[in-house]
Structures are given as structure tokens and as C-alpha cells.
Regions:
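Conserved "HGTGT" condensation-loop signature of ketosynthase/thiolase-family condensing enzymes
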Residues: 1-77, 113-139
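Conserved catalytic cysteine-centered active-site region
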Residues: 54-106
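Gly/Pro-rich active-site capping loops and adjacent beta-alpha segments
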Residues: 103, 107, 112-117
Length: 139
């Protein structure tokens, strides 16, 4: 198998749950980054054959296609969203390598979407009825 060239790579910022990025949707973080990577590589957005995006906390929709459009890819770009709780970004890169190796694409954007900042706060629901234990109040 031939080596798969990586023209550029970058990382979006991360923050804790409910932190500074809680109001940002994943494609809003990634689109400027992808546009910059394409510009640095000297490629127009129309050169992208596919976008493969790993997503750990999907809330519906199609984040890979939304990212492709937000980064400037015209038309209806081929896009694949992989929904996985662990290693979603790595799975996306592996899938992109397959597209390249099989000759199905020449230029692929691949990676993971940061969405943990937007994770909902989930509380454990008791399995039986009864009074809930109270935490001590402030001093």
C-alpha cells in the first residue's frame, strides 16, 4: 500500500463541560480551521472530494456536511459522519485513508469534532421511589 500524505493538520481548542466553548457548535470551531488548512495547502474548497468527521456527542443532523459547507465547500459535498463514543477522530482518519487507497478520493478532510463542552449535564435517576438524600447546605 502507498503512503498516505498528510498535507496539514491542526487542533481545535478544547474546554471543560459547560466551559468557554459551550456556546460553540463543533462546525463553528472547525470551519475556520479547515478553511485555513486548505488555504495553507493552496487548495480551493472545491478540491475536497470528501469530509469524514468523527463525532462523540452527536445531537442529530450531519456534522460532517455542515462543516464542509461552513468551510466553503460548494454544492452538496460528499460527507460522512462517524458516531462513536471513543476514537471517533481516529476512525475518521482511518476511513479517509481507505477512500484515498481505493482511489475514491484525492483530497479528504478528516478528523474529530469537539463537542464535550456542550455535553448535557445528566443526573442519575434513582431506580426506586423514596426520599432523595440531601447534600449539606452552605455553611
Amino acid at each position: 500500500m502507498n503512503a498516505m500524505p498528510i498535507l496539514a493538520w491542526a487542533r481545535t481548542p478544547v474546554a471543560p463541560v459547560g466551559g468557554a466553548l459551550a456556546a460553540c457548535r463543533p462546525h463553528e470551531l472547525a470551519a475556520p480551521l479547515v478553511a485555513r488548512l486548505l488555504a495553507d495547502a493552496g487548495l480551493p474548497a472545491s478540491a475536497v472530494d470528501a469530509v469524514v468527521l468523527g463525532n462523540a456527542l452527536g445531537a442529530g443532523g450531519h456534522p460532517a456536511r455542515v462543516l464542509a459547507r461552513a468551510a466553503g465547500r460548494p454544492g452538496r459535498p460528499p460527507a460522512i459522519t462517524l458516531d462513536s463514543q471513543c476514537c471517533a477522530g481516529l476512525d475518521a482518519i482511518t476511513h479517509a485513508c481507505g477512500l484515498l487507497a481505493l482511489g475514491q478520493a484525492q483530497v479528504v478532510i478528516a478528523g474529530g469534532a469537539e463537542a464535550w463542552s456542550r455535553a448535557p449535564l445528566r443526573l442519575h435517576r434513582p431506580t426506586q421511589a423514596g426520599p432523595a438524600p440531601l447534600a449539606p447546605g452552605p455553611p
